[in-house]
C-alpha cells in the first residue's frame, strides 16, 4: 500500500506488520511460559532451602540438648573440654615459639594432673568407682592408725622414768636436731628448777603467764574508767596473787625478768609504745568526729574543729576528762539527730552525770533520745523517774512544736532536762569528800596530759614525715632537671645534624622522643616544686599545725538543714495520713454502675440544653457542664445511700447539697456570660479587621487609577502588609511595619532592575533555548512516544477498518525529528561562534567555534535556510556534517539523518529507519517495525530490563 503525502512516497507492507505482530505474540507467550517455569523452579528451590535450613536447625538444637544432658549427668565433661582446648592452644603457641620450653613442660604436667583428677572424679560418679575409692581410703586410714598406735606405744615406753626435759632431748635426737634444740632444752630445765623453787608446777606457771597480760589490761582499763585504786587492787591483785601461788612467788617471777639491760630496753620500748598509743588516740578522736559528721550528712551543721572546741570548752568547767567528753560528742554526732546547740547541752550534762555517778555515757544519752523522738512524751516519761518538771512546761514545749517546729521543741526540751540534771550533778560534786575530789582532779589531769602528749606526738610524726618527704622531693627535682638538660643536649645535637645537606630526616623519631622527655621533665619539676612549697608551708606551722589542719578538713559544702529534716518529717506524716484515708475509703464497696449513671445523667442534661437552643452561637460553658455533673453526682449518691455505706466526703456533699448546687448555678451563669462575652469580643475583632481591610482596599482602588496591572498588584500587596500588621495588634507608625514595607519596596526595585537589563534577558532566552535543544532525553522521549502512539492508532485503524493513513503520522514524526536536529544545529552554531560549548547527540561537548568552521556542503534533497551572523546560507546537511566532524558521533540508538548520493534521505529513530524519497520506490515500514520490536525485546532482556529484573527477583540474585 503506497500513499503520497506532500510529494513524499510512503510504502507500507501490511503482511510484514502482521507477521511481526504474530511473532511478538508468540514470543510474549513463550516468555510468560518461561517466567512461570522459572518461578516454579525458584519456589521449589526456596522450599528445599527452607527445609534444609529447618533440618540443620533441628540437628543443632538436638546436639545442644544432648550436650546439656551430658553436662548435667557428668559435670566433668565441660571441664575436660576446656582443658582439651587449652592444651591445643598451648601446643600451637609452643610451636610458634611464644611459650618457652620450660613453661610448656610445666604447664603440660599441670594439664596431665588436672586430666587425671577429672578422670578419677568421673570414675567416682559410678558405683564401681565409689567402691574402689572407699576401699583405698579405708586401707590408707588403717595404715595411718596402725602407725600412730605404734608411735604412741613406743613413746610411752621411752617416757618411763624420764623428765619432760629428757623426753624433749630424746625427741630431738630422733629428729636429728639435738644440737639445735640443746639451748632451748637448757632453758626448760632452768624454768623447771625455778618452778620447783616457787612451789608451783610448770602447767600452773604457763597458765598464770598466759593470763597475766589480760589481768594487766583489766587493771589499766579499770583505772582509766575512773575506778578507785583500792578497788582495783582488791579485784585484780588477788587474782594475780592466786595465779602465782602467793604474793612472794608473784614478785619472784616478776623480779626474775628484771636486770639493767632488760630494764633499759623495757623503759625505751614502753616509752615508744606509750607515745604511739597517745598519737593513735589523738588521731582516732579527730577522725571519729569527722566520720560521724560525714555519715550523717553534716546535720549538726558544724565541722570537726568546732565540735572539738565545744569539747575543750566543756572540759574547762567539767569534772569529766577530755577523752570521755570527745567520746560523748562523737556518739551524739553519729546519731544524726541533734544540732550543734543540742549536742553542746547534752554533752555537758552527760559528762557531769557520768563523772558524778559512774553511769555510762551511752545510758545517759539514751535518756535524751527519748526527747529527740517526741519532746512532749519524752519529757513526760523522764519526769516519772527524775521528777523535774513544773506546771506549764509541757504545754510550752507542745506549743513550740506546733508553732516553730519539731527541732525547736527538741532543743528547748533538751536544754530544760540538761539544765536540771547539770545542777543536780553539781550538787553531788560539791558534796564529795576530799579524797574523791583529789582522785577526780588526778584523773582529769592525767587525761589532759595524755591528750597533750597524743596531739604533740601525732603532729611530730607528721612533721618528720614531711621533712623526709621534702628531702626526697628535692632529690627528684635535681634528677628531673638533669633529665631536661640531657634531653635538650641530645635534641640540639640532632637538630644540628639535620641542618647538614641530605640529613634532614636524621633521628626524627629520637628527636620527638627527646622533646617529649623535656616537656615531661619540666612538668614533673613544676609539680614537685608545688608539692615542696606545700610541705614547707606545713612545716613552718610546727607540729600542732597538722592537728589543726586535721580538725579543719572535710568541711561539708552543704549541711543538712533543720528545715529540710522538718519538711521530711511533715511529708511523712502527710503520706501516712493520706494512706489512712485511702485505706478507710477502700473498705467502701461502690456499685460498678455508679460512675456510668452519673455520666449518663450529666450527658442527658447537656443534651436537653442543646435541644432548647434558641440563640445564635449559644455554647455550653465549662461551669455549666460542671453544674450538670454535680447534680448528677448528688442524684446518684441519693440512690446509693440506701444500698451502701457512704464515705465522709460523700456524706458531706449530701448534707450541703443545696448550697453546693446554688454555688454551682452561680458559677454556671457567670461561665455562660464569659463564653458569650468571648463570642462578642471575637465578633468585634472580626468586624474591625473587615473594616480595616475594606478601607485599605478602597484606598488602594482609588490610588490605582491610571496605573498598570503590575503597579496595581504592587499597591495591593503593600496595602495587605499594612492591613495584616494592624489587624495583628500593631499600629501604622510602628518601625517594624516601616521596615517590612521598605523590604518589599527593595524587592520591587530589584525586580525593575532585572526587567531593564536587556542583555540578561537575551542570555536567559538563549540559555532556555539551549536547554530545550540539548535536552536529548526529553526530545527523543517525546518523539518515541509520539511514534509509538501514532503506530498504535494506525494499527487500530487498520485492524478495524482495513485501511491505514500514514500521512499524518509521517508528517508529525519527521517534523519532530527535523525540528530537534535543526534546534541543535542552530544552538551549536551560535554557541560555537560566541566561544561557548557545543553538544552532540551522544552527550559529548566541545568548545569554540569549530562547529561552524568545519561545516562542508553535502548533497541533499532539501535545503533549509537559516540566518547567521554573516548572513550566509548553510544547508541542514552541511550543518549536520560539521557537527559530525566536531565530535557529534551518533550511536546506534541516536537519531541520525543520512543523505544518500541519490538524493534520498533516511531518518533513523531508535533503530527504525524512515526513508523519505521523492518519486523513488520506498523500502517500506516493515523493516522499521521489526527493528523496533527487536530492540524492545533486547532491552527488556538485558541488564536493567523488565524481564531481567523479574528473573533476578525470583532467583534472589
Curated annotation (Swiss-Prot):
InterPro entries: GpH_LAMBDA, Phage_tape_meas_C, Phage_tape_measure_N. The keyword Coiled coil applies. It is found in: Virion. One of its GO terms (biological process) is symbiont genome ejection through host cell envelope, long flexible tail mechanism. Residues 42-72 form a coiled coil. Pfam families: Tape_meas_lam_C, TMP_2. Keywords: Coiled coil, Viral genome ejection through host cell envelope, Viral long flexible tail ejection system, Viral penetration into host cytoplasm, Viral release from host cell, Viral tail assembly, Viral tail protein, Virion, Virus entry into host cell. It comes from the Viruses. GO terms for cellular component: virus tail. Belongs to the Lambdavirus tape measure protein family. Serves as a ruler that controls the length of tail by stopping the tail tube polymerization and is probably released from the tail shaft during infection to facilitate DNA translocation into the host cell. Assembles into a multimeric linear form probably arranged as a coil of alpha-helices and stabilized by the covering tail assembly proteins. Its C-terminus fixes the tail tip complex, thereby forming the tail assembly initiator complex. Tail tube proteins polymerize around the tape measure protein, displacing the tail assembly proteins. Interacts with the tail initiator complex presumably through its C-terminus domain. Interacts with the tail assembly proteins. NCBIfam families: tape_meas_lam_C. This is Tape measure protein. It comes from Escherichia phage T1.
